[in-house]
């Protein structure tokens, strides 16, 4: 659990635009697999499970990381509120598996390519949270529904 917590705090830092190693600014770059064909398995074109991925690069030190596009959203207050409302503490979880399941099992829908716009929908119990993002993966709309 200690390793998961450290990694999650690094992701929260990156999603907030701060390098978890030196505190400098992080540059965030969105990548979209245009030939994405994954449905439950990794895509043969990009190797990912989702079409949208993100790369993080420190502007000061050698730190870089990346992964699923949703990583850029993990510090969003609406998503954090959604997690805690459903009994999941993203910093000190009772169940790492439950938090991972909620954060990483989401629906992704690309609404437009130019300008880029996509939706990420998270589910917990009988409720959904849909975050709409722009080309910088900044949240431009947030909708919770039962």
Residue ranges and their predicted role:
Residues 1-3, 8, 146:
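Long, charged N-terminal interaction/targeting segments
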Residues 2, 33-50, 58-59, 73-88:
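Short cysteine/histidine-rich metal-coordination sites, predominantly Zn2+-binding motifs
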Residues 5-16, 27, 31, 46-52:
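Short, flexible, mixed-charge glycine/proline-rich loop motifs
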Residues 11, 21-23, 47-48, 93-99:
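Short glycine-rich, low-complexity/disordered patches
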Residues 15-20, 41, 54-56:
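Cys/His-enriched microdomains
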Residues 19-25, 46, 59-62:
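Short Cys/His-rich metal-coordination motifs, predominantly Zn2+-binding knuckles/fingers
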Residues 26-33, 67-73:
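Short Cys/His-rich "knuckle" micro-motifs
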Residues 64-146:
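Long, contiguous alpha-helical scaffold regions
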């Amino acid at each position: 659990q200690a390793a998961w917590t450290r990694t999650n705090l690094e992701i929260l830092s990156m999603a907030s635009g701060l390098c978890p190693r030196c505190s400098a600014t992080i540059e965030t770059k969105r990548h979209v697999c245009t030939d994405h064909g994954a449905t439950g398995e990794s895509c043969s074109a990009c190797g990912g499970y989702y079409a949208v991925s993100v790369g993080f690069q420190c502007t000061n030190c050698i730190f870089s990381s990346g992964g699923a596009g949703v990583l850029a959203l993990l510090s969003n207050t609406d998503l954090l509120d959604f997690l805690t409302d459903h009994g999941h503490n993203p910093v000190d979880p009772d169940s790492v598996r439950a938090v991972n399941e909620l954060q990483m099992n989401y629906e992704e829908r690309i609404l437009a390519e130019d300008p880029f716009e996509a939706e990420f929908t998270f589910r917990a119990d009988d409720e959904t949270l849909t975050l709409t993002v722009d080309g910088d993966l900044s949240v431009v709309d947030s909708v919770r529904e039962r």
